[in-house]
Every structure is written in structure tokens, then in C-alpha cells.
Amino acid sequence: MSTEKINFDIHKILTLLPHRYPILLVDRVLELEPHKAIKALKNVTVNEPFFTGHFPKRPVMPGVLIIEALAQAAALLTFAEAQPKDPENTLYYFVGIDNARFKRVVEPGDQLILNVTFERYIRGIWKFKAVAEVDGKVAAEAELMCTVKTADAAP
């Protein structure tokens, strides 16, 4: 098992995730240690489309989108784990969430650090511990589960 830590930019992320604007929520992978963990970044800007309605007078990033950002980071870690034969035809389905907690608001100008740690793989389900932080303080945390399928396979 390698201890080399990998990082990559948005161009590499776009080759691995099918998400695109406005739902692509990972801007950069800061560190990826295969078989262990990923640390990724989401720059939160006032130009995000969800801020138009959530909330006009005090923009706050919706908690479900923080969880989605964590799930996308988990998908990138899963990609490093699973190493699919056909990455462009591979989808990561978010299949479960446990113990989600929201600890602080995330606002425009914040840098959301997405920390996801691999816990286990059982019967086709990947399980992760996920924590989103701003300025070193926990904004949200959850246990996430996903599965990997080819795009032409039924979910």
C-alpha cells in the first residue's frame, strides 16, 4: 500500500465525476491517500445559484449541498479505491447517510474543507466518515454510503 499523497485540480475532477455546474461541488483535491482518505476544497462564492433564494438577506449554503459536496469527495476517493475499467461510464450512487449533523453555517467567502475517510467496503457498499470544516471548525459531519455502477446498468 502506497503512502504517497495525491492532489489534483478541477480538470482531473471533471474526468472522474459526471457532475457539472451548478451541482459540481468540489473545486480541488488537496490530498488523496488511496485506501485511506481524501481532503478536498469547495470555494463558496456569492455567485452560487442557490444563494438567490437561500437566503437573499443572509446567504447560507444549504446543508444538503454540504452533504452533497462530501459525497462527491467520497466518490473521488472511491474512484481511487475501485479503479474502474471504464471511468467515463462509471457512476457513484449515494445510497445512504447516517448521523448527519450541522454545526455552523457556511457563507459566501468561506473555504469548505471536505475530509472523507474510508471506513469499510461490504457487499458492494462503500462506507465513509465525512467532515466538512471552515477555518478549522466543523460545519457538518455524517457517515456516507455509496455504490459504484456502470452508467448503463440499472441503479
Swiss-Prot record:
Its EC number is 4.2.1.59. The active site is at 54. Pfam families: FabA (PF07977). It catalyses: a (3R)-hydroxyacyl-[ACP] = a (2E)-enoyl-[ACP] + H2O. GO terms for molecular function: (3R)-hydroxyacyl-[acyl-carrier-protein] dehydratase activity. Its main location: cytoplasm. Keywords: Cytoplasm, Lipid A biosynthesis, Lipid biosynthesis, Lipid metabolism, Lyase. It is found in: Cytoplasm. One of its GO terms (biological process) is lipid A biosynthetic process. It comes from the Bacteria. GO terms for cellular component: cytoplasm; membrane. InterPro entries: FabA_FabZ, FabZ, HotDog_dom_sf. It is an enzyme of class 4 (lyase). Belongs to the thioester dehydratase family. FabZ subfamily. Involved in unsaturated fatty acids biosynthesis. Catalyzes the dehydration of short chain beta-hydroxyacyl-ACPs and long chain saturated and unsaturated beta-hydroxyacyl-ACPs. HAMAP family: FabZ (MF_00406). This is 3-hydroxyacyl-[acyl-carrier-protein] dehydratase FabZ. It comes from Burkholderia mallei (strain ATCC 23344).
